[in-house]
Amino acid sequence: MRLTSLQRVGHTAVENNLSNASQRTILLKDENRLEQRLKEIPAEPGCYLMRDVEDRLLYVGKSKCLRNRVRSYFRSSSDHGPRIRLMVRQIAEIEFIVTDSEAESLVLESNLIKNQQPHFNVLLKDDKKYPYLCITWSEEYPRIFITRRRRFRNKNDRFYGPYVDVGLLRRTLLLVKRSFPLRQRPRPLHQDRTCLNYSIGRCPGVCQQKITPQDYHQVLRKVAMVFQGRNQELKVLLEKQMERYSDRMDYESAANIRDQIKGLEQLTEGQKMSLPDSSVSRDVLAIASDHRVAAVQLFQMRAGKLVNRLGFTADAVDQTLGSVLQRVIEEHYSQVDAVEVPPEVLVQYSLPQQELLVDWLSEHRGRRVQISCPQRQAKAELIELVERNAVFELSRAKSGQQQQELATEDLAQLLELTTQPRRIEGYDISHIQGSDAVASQVVFIDGLPAKQHYRKYKIKSSSIKSGHSDDFMAMAEIMRRRFRRWARVKQEGSNFENLQRCSGSALQTDGLNDWPDVVMIDGGKGQLSSAMEALRELDLHEDLVVCSLAKKHEQIFVPGQSKPLDSDPDQLGVVLLRRLRDEAHRFAVSYHRQQRGVRMNRSRLTDIPGLGPRRVRDLLAHFQSIDAIQLASVQQISQAPGLGPALALQVWTYFHPEADIALEEVA
């Protein structure tokens, strides 16, 4: 890439001297700014980024000619769908990154979309029903586990998936752990000895370093081949290794390898679907869509057998099926190793930039990759098979969506709302006798958790402290902090009603997009009264729909009524509120435990002579937990920021008072 830093189009000296965000906002609202930008865009390959007046990223795109591509959005003759037309009306700023080639821009675009999540791009949904398998290569002794969250704590960690059949994934991992000795626990069970897993051959004893990191990585690389679909290649590798051990008369090691081969054969026995040609390796992608959501299935065929079935869900509004397929291909193959890219990829529809993808995949693999859209014979039958699976996954997703719509409709009837609530928020308080008091705000959108909108609060009231709790006061404080911004908008008369209606939609561009249709308080009449009193102070008590859900008999209370609403605990609207209440409780309790653990850890470390608040904070940041500090050696502790050998010895001695070690031995 020729220009590695972000280039703002027409970046002036005035912009270089901007001292605060308000000045930049003034420039973004300049009517002539965008017209000037369009004149200065270079006719070179690269990526372009479009922002609104609030400097929020709307869209990321790529092109072999930035000037022609960006200008096409603003031509009256361009045939854009309603989604793109809506985006164009919001564009206030255009930025670009110039690259050496169009292939480079494709990789850059994929990374920008993944990291920034622009609103108008075709985004793969964070669908937690499809699990991943993670290998933490960033650790000295990596772990392997199943997760539904694809979060890279370290760029070296590796995710495989998302897998459609979680049962098959669990059985595969169980068989792998029986065949290959792997780290079984996230933390050691004992400080000074191995556990039972080592004794029965399930673990190589990583907690006591019975195996070197290099040898353990060799074992794990073989395991990774299973989830890369390279079973046949792994079998050949193991057979050669077994022969070498036999030639050296190391029959015990040869027997261990033989058992691993048997375990691998058990895995391949379950791969019933196969192709006539056992040498064929290809990926097959098909899609099913209802014009709102698309379900994409990817079948991985290796050595003639179906080894993996992956599933993706993507936004499909105002998108062609080919563009959705292309986005899935870009997302998936940008995160796999070169050995996982097959020589052939079959797709159901032609891709908008198929030749570019062929070049990019070929470069990534190191050998030629072919992308084709078959119409006849066996390859077309494969596409039809994958499409049937995609249709099934889409219908299953729509069935769950219909259930959520029925729940929100029932809730609207229960609370006498004129429209179905789209955004509902739940609040709960958590503490132990007033200590470490916190609150949670959880959000459901269209009946499903929207975790990107969750919020955590530390209770600031000085009257709520250890030994003195007041849930009512805490709830009132949270209501004030949550809605005071909206109260200011209402007082200023800034078109308050229109902002409420547009909140949460793509039409809203003023930054106020979090007005809830329903607010639910975890508790009874007391908590509800406290919340309403706080909202009355903000003059929002008549604008918000507020209710509370008491644990006893799942009773729903609303303002102005002393008795609970007439409802059935099993009706869909009540079940939705109960899910919201339970999620708010879980989120609040987990945050409270986190805060309590931090406080207890700090108080324990502050007992060590020479450790002040800053060094305690640095030590915890370095090791993440007291247990890790306790298991560390003096040399490892001395590597923490601000700790030399003498202070590291002091810390180590605090946790090992029976040990006898001198500073000279450490040095």
UniProtKB/Swiss-Prot annotation:
Compartment(s) where it occurs, according to its Swiss-Prot or TrEMBL record: Cytoplasm
A molecular function (GO) held by this record is: DNA binding
Ranges for the UVR domain?
232-267
| Keyword Cytoplasm listed | yes
Q: What does this gene product do?
A: The UvrABC repair system catalyzes the recognition and processing of DNA lesions. UvrC both incises the 5' and 3' sides of the lesion. The N-terminal half is responsible for the 3' incision and the C-terminal half is responsible for the 5' incision.
Please give the family membership noted in the entry.
Belongs to the UvrC family.
Do the record's keywords include Repeat? no
Assembly and interactions?
A: Interacts with UvrB in an incision complex.
List the protein's name: UvrABC system protein C
What is the top-level taxon of the source organism? Bacteria
Alphabetical keyword list: Cytoplasm, DNA damage, DNA excision, DNA repair, Excision nuclease, SOS response
GO BP? nucleotide-excision repair; SOS response
CDD domains linked:
GIY-YIG_UvrC_Cho
Spell out the SMART domains in the cross-references. Answer: GIYc (SM00465)
One of its Pfam families is GIY-YIG
Occurrences of domain GIY-YIG (ranges) = 43-122
Q: Please tell me the species this chain comes from.
A: Prochlorococcus marinus (strain MIT 9313)
Q: Name one GO cellular component term.
A: cytoplasm
Instruction: Fetch the InterPro entries from UniProt.
Output: GIY-YIG_endonuc (IPR000305), GIY-YIG_endonuc_sf (IPR035901), GIY-YIG_UvrC_Cho (IPR047296), RuvA_2-like (IPR010994), UVR_dom (IPR001943), UVR_dom_sf (IPR036876), UvrABC_protein_C (IPR050066), UvrC (IPR004791)
